Amino acid sequence: MLDRILSKSRSRYDTSDRTYGARHDRVGRHAGLSRIADEIRDDIALARVVFSTPTLPGQLAAPDPIGDAPPGITYTVETPHDAGIVITINDVPADWGWISAGGVEAVSPALRALAGELAKLMDGYNHYGAHIGRRFFGRIRVGGETLIW
């Protein structure tokens, strides 16, 4: 949890032509995707418990898309391919996750913020650079729709 809080001030670190995510060292550089997926699951579970606690009246509440999401939402973190991690957001309430604009359903800003926060969390375990490839490719999905690739 401390890594999550500190990542706001300590984002990526660069080494010549390589960029490493803030959580890259937590799993070790030779860790497999299943280990990284386990860490992502733990980060999501911890964020839901810590950041979903209500604040007392008169206190400032820091917005957190994971903690502010409806409690019925569930998450699955899978590694369906050798170089891919997929986070799927399930059981999203229709009135919270989608808006209707001119008869067309679109993803709500709250669901986009949640997907963006999950993508940042997942990207914290990644690395990339000019002479190295990505450690993995990540996707954030809701149902059959990919929100972030």
Regions found by a protein language model. Give the residues of each.
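Intrinsic low-complexity, intrinsically disordered or marginally ordered coil/linker segments
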Residues: M1-W149
